[in-house]
């Protein structure tokens, strides 16, 4: 009889545990989904900020070209557009600013506006590494950067990443100066101010892993 009671208790405990796990499985799945969604949201926000910075810098370059070709009105339009992109209050610039170990302006915020990934200069080709690079390229084409990097790491391929950093405060000030100078029809000086915005970009190179 005791054995029967004990067996009944164990069965009841196991049954309740199964129900508890079943009840909590959707919660765990929901939490995981929320984490994935938050990660995707953060990545999308960072990408949007980088795009705004990159578009602003392209506007600066084309504005200088417009001045060179004698089209100050176009230069003014592009400069205003670049300034608007960097003054967007809805963008959380500080949240995605890169803490700079190599930056030369301590009171500024550096924004990653572009990046490139390449093979280390010390790379020596082997059939295995060539195959890994091919697979990595396929994964990169599908947007799987993490998988591509892991493929190269496992194959012992050294990878370097170059990040192009824009000093936000300095660039905003340079654009404000350029706008004032364009309004005064001081086009040579405006071009120099725009050049100053371009020259503020720095490149931060980092070895993701070495071979």
Swiss-Prot record:
Claim: Plastid is one of the keywords in the record: no
Stated induction or repression of this protein's expression: By EvgA.
Alphabetic keyword roster: Signal
InterPro entries with a match to the protein in the record: Uncharacterised_YfdX
Gene3D superfamilies registered for this protein in UniProt: 6.10.250.2140, YfdX protein domain
Signal peptide: 1-21
Domain of life: Bacteria
NCBIfam families xref list: PRK10316.1 (NF007645)
Protein name: Protein YfdX
Organism expressing this protein natively: Escherichia coli (strain K12)
Gene from which this protein is expressed: yfdX
